[in-house]
């Protein structure tokens, strides 16, 4: 037998070389085992065995049937042979693996995997654990060889997965099926179905059963989830129009019964992003306890209920009002409570009971919070793709959470990079490596063009300015080079040649990567999602190269060459504008933004400086403008002050927000235009009737003297005809002392140009 070394990932990444004895049937082997997610403990071996194709299965009659099916598919073996490698598979207590009980970890979903020249043991602490043992075995097979090893493994976080809880276009049925398989392969056990734009999930149709087509699809999702060891959780969002009476209790239970008939065995109730009567904590607790006692506990095979509270983050919590403490004391202890962190979009940290973090919320709700992590969700920055690494959450807080689920983008395939990282993080936080997980995800999602996808994802990670103030690193390796180049060029009219060459290489690689990805056929769904951003990404690379060439033409004193490049740059800017107009035209943040954190500001500043130098040198008046936002928004309302302004032709609009905005008494929002314009319509939708009872609309020609504008409302919509009145600024004020709960669905100023 070869000498075997214990490699404990808690003392991670030790370099070693084991001494190996030679014997028949085994091959020399010296390589660290790489499994996703990283196991808790591995015995590294220095030998491999060859798979013969003949296997003696032990435990088929007792073990998880889905694990058995996955194993036979993996080994391409339909039945047990009379000779060959003996395979023992089963759960703790099964006859087939009873002699290995002492090796099986006692944690939920834990497993023990042993591979040697005589046997393969796949022993789970439960059925999930057995399935995960098979998934690990699948990753270990390389060119029909297996390493001689032992793995003892289990997850640190009990529930790990995805909540489809974003606003926007729900995923397609086929995308969900692909995702469920991906979750199983990466040991994620939870998929919460809660798309905000599913009419039968939310108001007003949550009381109605799904039509036949949709019901059939959900039934298939439930079955595929089971086959991949994923818990399909169906969520309902009744809070906006629920009545706290027996009729709606019965309506909710009837809907749950309908879902139960479709195979659903796990449920969630969401009370997020609502206002009015549905936000009362005592009523929510009463209803959820009723469901728990009359449905969950009665059914026996239904898992504990999950709820998303109305106050689901610290910044919106009114601790003195008692909402969270009411849930903590009145809600049955088996019910999970979801939490997004200190803000709507936030990373998780340990904290303390006084200031914030996981300890703060757990103290209030008297149980570990079930984390709803709002990344890479992009429903508030829909003109961006968020394809960067998963990072920012503390690495030693697994014991402070009951679950960790990621809320993804509406772009299902593009979300897989982050989902892969979350799978790795939630399984084994202590050794989580965000960069490794990100690069491994890229290789998994698009192996044939991993290099090109990494280039693209590197420059499509940040969110840009947004109402939540949440940002991500982007183009990180390029940032110091860009800063050094700009410092020299803006202050000394020169630049380091090595930085010039590195930037040129980067911009060239951007173009090449976009071209290669656009014709890739390995993952058509992914390429289709990325296509608008790939087009824009290539143009950005071209723009960068031409701007650098512009500086060189100026330095070489070739004005004709400068003008030729200037003309081309203007054409590229126009092309980027043209891409921004037809693609991704959602009503919230339409258009296509790429490489916005480091690269675009770098290109814009170089261009502006080069044109200014040219104008000075040749007494010219070339336009040095790049695209920019000439108008400004100011507000003392916390949830409004960071909302981006957007301009589409002659319309200036406030970027809509998905969540309820708490507009304090006497709070204002002011939009100041860059100059005086003839005013056309102003369109407003705050998602509530009778806005005139508290809201005052005013306009100004100078930003100092204000004139009140009367308006009328049709349902939730307000339109004021501007009649070409001169306007420089528009202001809206809550004139009362009372806080108003509104939605920023539309605030658009249209002017004549």
Question: Which stretches of residues belong to each language-model region?
Answer:
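Bacterial Sec-dependent N-terminal signal peptides
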Residues: 1-32
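Feature activates predominantly on carbohydrate-active enzymes
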Residues: 100, 105-255, 261-265, 297
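Catalytic-core regions of glycoside hydrolase
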Residues: 265, 274-439
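Disordered, acidic Ser/Thr/Pro-rich linker "stalks" and the adjacent N-terminal cap
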Residues: 599, 605, 609-679, 685-695, ...
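Acidic, contiguous N-terminal accessory segments
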Residues: 12, 30-117, 143-152
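Extracellular carbohydrate recognition and processing domains
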Residues: 704-723
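Noncatalytic modules at the cell exterior or secretory-pathway interfaces
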Residues: 722-736
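C-terminal functional modules
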Residues: 434-625
């Amino acid at each position: 037998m070869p000498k075997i070394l214990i490699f404990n990932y808690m003392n991670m990444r030790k370099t070693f070389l084991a001494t190996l004895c030679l014997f028949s049937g085994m091959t020399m082997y010296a390589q660290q085992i790489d499994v996703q997610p990283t196991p808790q403990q591995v015995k590294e071996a220095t030998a491999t065995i060859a798979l013969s194709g003949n296997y003696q299965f032990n435990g088929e009659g007792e073990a998880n049937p889905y694990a058995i099916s996955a194993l036979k598919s993996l080994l391409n073996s339909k039945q047990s042979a009379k000779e060959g490698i003996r395979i023992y598979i089963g759960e703790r207590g099964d006859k087939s693996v009873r002699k290995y009980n002492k090796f099986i970890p006692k944690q939920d979903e834990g497993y023990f995997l042993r591979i040697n020249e005589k046997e393969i043991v796949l022993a789970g602490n439960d059925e999930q654990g057995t399935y995960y043992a098979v998934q690990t075995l699948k990753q270990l097979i390389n060119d029909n060889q297996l390493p001689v090893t032992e793995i003892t493994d289990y997850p640190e976080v009990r529930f790990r997965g995805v909540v489809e809880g974003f606003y926007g276009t729900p995923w397609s049925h086929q995308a969900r099926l692909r995702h469920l398989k991906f979750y199983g392969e990466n040991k994620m056990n939870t998929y919460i179905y809660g798309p905000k734009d599913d009419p039968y999930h939310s108001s007003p149709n949550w009381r109605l059963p799904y039509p036949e087509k949709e019901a059939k699809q959900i039934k298939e999702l439930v079955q595929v989830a089971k086959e991949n060891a994923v818990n399909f959780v169906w969520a309902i969002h009744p809070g906006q129009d629920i009545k706290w009476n027996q009729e709606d209790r019965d309506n909710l239970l009837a809907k749950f019964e309908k879902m139960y008939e479709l195979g659903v065995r796990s449920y969630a109730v969401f009370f997020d992003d609502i206002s009015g009567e549905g936000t009362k904590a005592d009523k929510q607790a009463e209803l959820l306890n009723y469901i728990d006692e009359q449905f969950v506990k009665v059914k026996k095979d239904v898992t504990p209920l999950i709820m998303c509270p109305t106050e689901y983050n610290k910044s919106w919590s009114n601790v003195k009002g008692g909402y969270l403490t009411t849930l903590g004391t009145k809600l049955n202890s088996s019910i999970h409570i979801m939490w997004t962190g200190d803000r709507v979009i936030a990373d998780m940290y340990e904290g303390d009971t006084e200031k914030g973090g996981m300890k703060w919320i757990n103290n209030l709700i008297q149980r570990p919070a079930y984390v709803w992590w709002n990344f890479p969700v992009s429903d508030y920055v829909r003109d961006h793709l968020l394809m960067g690494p998963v990072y920012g959450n503390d690495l030693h807080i697994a014991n402070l959470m009951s679950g960790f689920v990621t809320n993804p983008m509406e772009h299902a395939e593009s979300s897989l990079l982050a989902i892969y990282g979350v799978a790795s993080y939630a399984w084994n936080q202590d050794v989580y490596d965000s960069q490794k997980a990100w690069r491994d995800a890229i290789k998994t999602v698009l192996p044939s063009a991993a290099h090109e996808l990494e280039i693209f994802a590197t420059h499509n990670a940040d969110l840009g300015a947004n109402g939540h103030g949440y940002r991500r690193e982007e183009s990180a390796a390029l940032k110091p080079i860009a800063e050094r180049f700009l410092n020299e060029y803006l202050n000394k009219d020169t630049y380091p040649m090595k930085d010039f060459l590195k930037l040129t290489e980067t911009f060239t690689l951007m173009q090449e990567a976009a071209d290669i990805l656009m014709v890739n056929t390995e993952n058509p769904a992914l390429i289709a999602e990325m296509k608008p951003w790939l087009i824009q990404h290539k143009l950005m690379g071209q723009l960068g190269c031409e701007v650098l060439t512009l500086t060189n033409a100026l330095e070489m004193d070739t004005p004709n060459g400068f003008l030729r490049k200037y003309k081309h740059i203007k054409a590229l800017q126009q092309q980027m504008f043209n891409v921004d107009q037809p693609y991704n035209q959602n009503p919230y943040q339409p258009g296509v933004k790429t490489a916005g954190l480091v690269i675009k500001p770098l290109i814009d500043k170089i261009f502006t400086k080069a044109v200014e130098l040219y104008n000075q040198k040749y007494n010219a008046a070339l336009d040095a403008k790049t695209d920019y936002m000439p108008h400004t928004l100011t507000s003392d309302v916390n949830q409004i002050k960071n909302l981006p302004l957007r301009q589409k032709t002659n319309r200036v609009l406030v970027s809509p927000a998905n969540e309820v905005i708490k507009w304090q008494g006497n709070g204002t929002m002011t939009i100041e235009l860059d100059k005086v314009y003839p005013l056309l319509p102003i369109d407003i939708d705050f998602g509530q009737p009778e806005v005139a009872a508290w809201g005052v609309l005013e306009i100004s020609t100078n930003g100092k003297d204000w004139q009140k504008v009367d308006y009328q409302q049709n349902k939730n919509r307000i339109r004021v005809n501007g009649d070409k009145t001169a306007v420089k600024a528009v202001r809206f004020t809550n004139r009362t002392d009372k806080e108003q709960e509104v939605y920023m669905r539309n605030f658009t100023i249209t002017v004549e140009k």
